[in-house]
Amino acid sequence: MNKKKKVIIAISGGVDSSVSAWFLKKSGYHVEGVFMKNWEEINSSIKCTFKKDLKDAQIVCDQIGININIVNFSEQYWNKVFKIFLREYKIGNTPNPDILCNKEIKFKYFLNFAIKEMQADYIATGHYVRKINFNGKSQLFSAFDLKKDQSYFLHQINYKELSKCIFPIGNILKSKVRYIASKLNLITSKKRDSTGICFIGNKNFNKFIKNYLHDDPGLIFSTEKKQIGTHKGLMYYTIGQRKGLNIKKIYYNCHDPWYVVDKKIDKNYLIVSQGKNNPYLMSTSIIIIETNWIDQIYLKNPIKCMVKTRYRQNSTLCLVIPIDKKSIEVIFYKPISSVAPGQYAVFYLLDRCLGGGIIKSRKLVIDK
């Protein structure tokens, strides 16, 4: 008699991981859940949704009929994710902690814990992505439900890690996930999807970040070098942002809103310009560092592919030119708006995610 394959699923207390767990058990795997605690509520004014999510996870595992384990990765999260998050904000970048969390916590610490400590054959998550064997390696592909596709957030893992992963809902629509959860009467069937940064929860970002970084107010200048306001601290703004600038109407040259187009870290200046498609927002190329190729084969020659420089963005055609093993230049066939250093550029060939890296710098339309 063949022994059942053991799968440890990351149970978050949400509908996606709940239905994923049900699919796995229905498919005949020996399934156990792990609820990861990645954040310690040191400051009582900062409430994460940990307790509510844990309770929902425990109830849903009981409904499905699987055991649940609680594993604390908060120390690893602090050192490998949150410290980097703070460091990047401090120097004016716009980091993405969810990508770091997937890279360092879910698909490294959790994966190793499940395989070594729990003798699992695989781990599973409720991510909307697909894993397909391609050229003899496990590769990452966009989800069937493109509106929910999360391959952008998983591009930092590699084919070896992918080979140990199962994504049960990558081939179905989100609406069907909700439908299945409702038919099973799972407690999470009507639970809202989590949004924003996990350790902030429903709290205001500005209030949260003040607990860790000091405000450093400064001046706002237009691209014409005219002082037109003050800012609360560069860490509160990102390239392409239009809300929260509070620029007085007397400084408007037209009806177009003001947008953040640059940060002068050395002088603590915030630079703004009017119009969504103004040349100070439009980039023709970018430099990427810490590039990860999922198949772990480094580029030797330029390739033409599609790229996203932020999650909710249509991919655009580009030419990728290798500089060294971890650095590349990306030339856009058409200029794109609001590229933010510190964010990630992620590359695709059709629906296959090739990998990506951190945006170090950009070349604007106006640059010679």
Curated annotation (Swiss-Prot):
One of its GO terms (cellular component) is cytoplasm. Its main location: cytoplasm. Its EC number is 2.8.1.13. InterPro entries: MnmA-like, MnmA-like_C, MnmA-like_central, MnmA-like_central_sf, Rossmann-like_a/b/a_fold. The record marks H127, Q343 as: Interaction with tRNA. Residues 148-150, 310-311 are annotated as: Interaction with tRNA. It catalyses: S-sulfanyl-L-cysteinyl-[protein] + uridine(34) in tRNA + AH2 + ATP = 2-thiouridine(34) in tRNA + L-cysteinyl-[protein] + A + AMP + diphosphate + H(+). Keywords: ATP-binding, Cytoplasm, Disulfide bond, Nucleotide-binding, RNA-binding, Transferase, tRNA processing, tRNA-binding. The active site is at C101 (nucleophile), C198 (cysteine persulfide intermediate). It is an enzyme of class 2 (transferase). It holds the Pfam family tRNA_Me_trans_C. The keyword Acyltransferase does not apply. GO terms for biological process: tRNA wobble position uridine thiolation. GO terms for molecular function: ATP binding; tRNA binding; tRNA-uridine 2-sulfurtransferase activity. ATP binds at A10, I11, S12, G13, G14, V15, D16, S17, M36, G126. Residues 96-98 are annotated as: Interaction with target base in tRNA. It is found in: Cytoplasm. Disulfide bonds join C101-C198. Belongs to the MnmA/TRMU family. Catalyzes the 2-thiolation of uridine at the wobble position (U34) of tRNA(Lys), tRNA(Glu) and tRNA(Gln), leading to the formation of s(2)U34, the first step of tRNA-mnm(5)s(2)U34 synthesis. Sulfur is provided by IscS, via a sulfur-relay system. Binds ATP and its substrate tRNAs. Interacts with TusE. This is tRNA-specific 2-thiouridylase MnmA. It comes from Wigglesworthia glossinidia brevipalpis. The gene is mnmA.
